[in-house]
């Protein structure tokens, strides 16, 4: 396992674009006998993924908001420490919905795995998982927690530096009016000024932006603007 962590650290340091990084992660997973890999970054209920899991599973995961149900994500948030997991071994402790989730994942060769979560900036977290079709992960020795966190920390930095395109992410949208108003907000206008420029009432701007803030689950226009820019919605 230490050899795997060394390989991950080396991969994060290789020069190249995001395609080289994604191909390298896929090759690493295959070389060590895993079904695939998944990197998740979670910030204020917004989740993005870089993964080679099956396309249908990726779609189902995000369309059904499985990140809110996923026992692996829940455990990662609570302990921030490398761990192995198994849907079958944990079955007796799971809810009916969680058992159904694992059963669905097993259809795509995801039955067990190793996950390394780390804290990242501004209250966010990232986690890297290698998934297996085996009923459980058989570790020959305990994983070095410090080495694991260091390897994933370097991977997170590399993905952030490359501004890697997510394989999949939470659905997000702005309607045309919301996008227009928010573009003006992004360049420093007040809501009153936006209303004047667009020839609408102040309340129309306020209500539209309030609706968008509620949808994105944020409490300020500044946060909404930052999310919209980050997700290239404006």
Swiss-Prot record:
Under the heading PROSITE patterns, the entry gives: HTH_LUXR_2
SMART domains for the chain: HTH_LUXR
Tell me which residues make up the HTH luxR-type domain.
167-232
One BP annotation, GO: quorum sensing
Task: State the source organism's domain of life.
Answer: Bacteria
**Which GO MF terms are attached to this record?**
DNA-binding transcription activator activity; sequence-specific DNA binding; transcription cis-regulatory region binding
| Residues within the DNA-binding region(s) | 191-210
Mind listing the UniProt keywords for this protein, alphabetically? Answer: Activator, Conjugation, DNA-binding, Plasmid, Quorum sensing, Transcription, Transcription regulation
Gene3D superfamilies, alphabetized: Transcription factor LuxR-like, autoinducer-binding domain, Winged helix-like DNA-binding domain superfamily/Winged helix DNA-binding domain
**One GO CC term on file:** protein-DNA complex
InterPro entries in alphabetical order: Sig_transdc_resp-reg_C-effctor, TF_LuxR_autoind-bd_dom, TF_LuxR_autoind-bd_dom_sf, Tscrpt_reg_LuxR_C, WH-like_DNA-bd_sf
- The UniProt entry's coiled-coil ranges are none
Its function, per the record, reads: Positive regulation of conjugal transfer of Ti plasmids. TraR activates target genes in the presence of AAI and also activates traR and traI themselves.
Family (UniProt): Belongs to the autoinducer-regulated transcriptional regulatory protein family.
The protein's name:
Transcriptional activator protein TraR
Protein's gene: traR
């Amino acid at each position: 396992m230490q050899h795997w962590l060394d390989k991950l650290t080396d991969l994060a340091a290789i020069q190249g674009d995001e395609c080289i990084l994604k191909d390298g992660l896929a090759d690493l997973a295959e070389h060590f006998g895993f079904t695939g890999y998944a990197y998740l970054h979670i910030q204020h209920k917004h989740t993005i993924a870089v993964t080679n899991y099956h396309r249908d599973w990726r779609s189902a995961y995000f369309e059904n908001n499985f990140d809110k149900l996923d026992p692996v994500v829940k455990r990662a948030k609570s302990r921030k420490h490398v761990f192995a997991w198994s849907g079958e071994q944990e079955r007796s402790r799971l809810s009916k919905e969680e058992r159904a989730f694992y059963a669905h994942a097993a259809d795509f060769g995801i039955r067990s795995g190793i996950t390394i979560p780390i804290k990242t900036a501004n209250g966010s977290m990232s986690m890297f998982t290698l998934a297996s079709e085996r009923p459980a992960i058989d570790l020959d020795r305990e994983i070095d927690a410090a080495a694991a966190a260091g390897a994933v920390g370097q991977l997170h930095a590399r993905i952030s530096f490359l501004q890697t395109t997510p394989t999949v992410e939470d659905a997000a949208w702005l309607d045309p009016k919301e996008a227009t108003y928010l573009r003006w907000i992004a360049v420093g206008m007040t809501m009153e000024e936006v209303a004047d420029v667009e020839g609408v009432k102040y309340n129309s701007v306020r209500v539209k932006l309030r609706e968008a803030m509620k949808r994105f689950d944020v409490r300020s226009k500044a946060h909404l603007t930052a999310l919209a820019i980050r997700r290239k919605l404006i």
